[in-house]
Amino acid sequence: MGKHTAIFDLHRSAGARLVDFAGWDMPLHYGSQVAEHQAVRQGVGIFDVSHMTVIELKGEKVRPFLHQLLANNVDRLTVPGTALYSCMLNTEGGVIDDLIVYLMAEQEFRVVSNAGTRDKVLAWIESHAAPFKVQVEERPELAMIAVQGPEARAQVHGQLPESLKEKVVNLKRFQATWEEGLFVARTGYTGEDGYELLLSGSQAQDWWRRLQAGGAKPCGLGARDTLRLEAGMCLYGADMDETTTPLESGLGWTVAWKPPERDFIGRAVLEAQQAAGCPHQQVGLLLQGKGLMRNGQTITTNLGEGVVTSGGFSPSLERSIALARVPVGADGPCEVQIRGRAVPAAMVKPPFVRNGRACVPAELMEPIEVS
C-alpha cells in the first residue's frame, strides 16, 4: 500500500481508479478521463496534488544560495508573493528537477517540486545548503489542491474568507498571497487559468467538498497529463531528466544568463553547449494519420532522427499529439514509427491548446480517424 494524501478517503469513496505514482496511491480518473479533461477546458476541475514536495528555505544567505542552486535568477523576485519557474541542474547541466520558487519574506523562500524526485531533490538541496547556513524544512503536513479552468477563479473566490478575497482577486499570474492556514497561488499545469491552494491537511477535505459542491469536477492524473501535454508543458522524467539540458528540452527560456558573474551549478556546461551549437531542439508533433504517439518512438525528420519524449491523445484536437526532441533546424513534415508503421506527422511549435483554444495551424487539422 502506498502513501495517502489527506483527501484520499474522498477519492476512494468517489470510486476513483487508483494507481501508484511515486509511492502514492493517487486517482488516475473517476470514470472518464476525457470528461475530466473537457471540464477543465470548459469549466472548472480540481486536482489533488498533495503528493508534490514543499520545501521552505530560510536564512540570511538564502538568496546567494539560490543564485547558485537554480538556473533561473531569484533576483527577479523582489516582492513577497512573487514566483518563478526554474530548473535545478547538476554539474553536467542535466535537469535534476523543475520547480516553482516563491518569495515568502526577505530571507525566506518556498519551493514546490515534483513528487517523484523528492529524495534526490532534498538530498541535493541539503548538500549545498550547509556553506550558506540555510535552514531546509520539508512541509509534508500541507495538502495541495489545484483548481483549474475558465471558471476556476470565480469558484475559488466564492469560497475564500473575506480577509483574503480582495488579495486573491488581484493576483496576477505567478503571484501568491496567504494568511494563516491558506496559501493561494495563481499557477497551474493545465494551460488554463486558476489557482493552486496550499493548506493544512485537516482543512483539505472540507475545501474539496465545498469546491465540488460549487460545481468543480474532480480530476485525476490522466487528465492532468493530457492537459499539460496540450499546453506544451514538460513532464519531468520524460521530456527532460539528468541526461538532458534545458537548452535541448524547450526550457532555454528558464535560464537566466545575466548577470554573467552568477555562477549557477551547470552554467559552464550550458555556455559550452550554447557556444558549440545545441544539437537538439524540442518541437511539437501533430499526427496526420492513425495511431498514438508515445514516449520513445523514433521520428524521421528532414535532418535525421529524433525521438518522442511524451505523447498521447488530445481530447481537444481529437488526434494524437506529442513533444519530441529532434535535430536543431528540423522542420516541416516528418514520420513517426508506430507499431512498425511510418505514420506522417507535422512539426509545430507548442503549445497545442491554451485557454481552451487550439494554437496549431488550421490547415493541419483535417479530420482523421485515430485508432
From Swiss-Prot:
InterPro entries attached to this UniProt entry: GCS_T, GCS_T_bac, GCST_C, GCV_T_N, GcvT/YgfZ/DmdA, GcvT/YgfZ_C, TrmE/GcvT_dom1
GO cellular component: cytosol; glycine cleavage complex
Organism, scientific name: Nitrosococcus oceani (strain ATCC 19707 / BCRC 17464 / JCM 30415 / NCIMB 11848 / C-107)
Top EC category: transferase
The enzyme's E.C. designation: 2.1.2.10
Family, per entry: Belongs to the GcvT family.
GO biological process entries: glycine decarboxylation via glycine cleavage system
Record bears the keyword Mitochondrion: no
Function: The glycine cleavage system catalyzes the degradation of glycine.
Name under which the protein is recorded: Aminomethyltransferase
A GO term, aspect molecular function: aminomethyltransferase activity
Quaternary structure and partners: The glycine cleavage system is composed of four proteins: P, T, L and H.
Keyword Transferase set for record: yes
Gene of this entry: gcvT
Swiss-Prot/TrEMBL keywords: Aminotransferase, Transferase
PANTHER family: AMINOMETHYLTRANSFERASE, AMINOMETHYLTRANSFERASE, MITOCHONDRIAL
Reaction equation(s) it catalyzes: N(6)-[(R)-S(8)-aminomethyldihydrolipoyl]-L-lysyl-[protein] + (6S)-5,6,7,8-tetrahydrofolate = N(6)-[(R)-dihydrolipoyl]-L-lysyl-[protein] + (6R)-5,10-methylene-5,6,7,8-tetrahydrofolate + NH4(+)
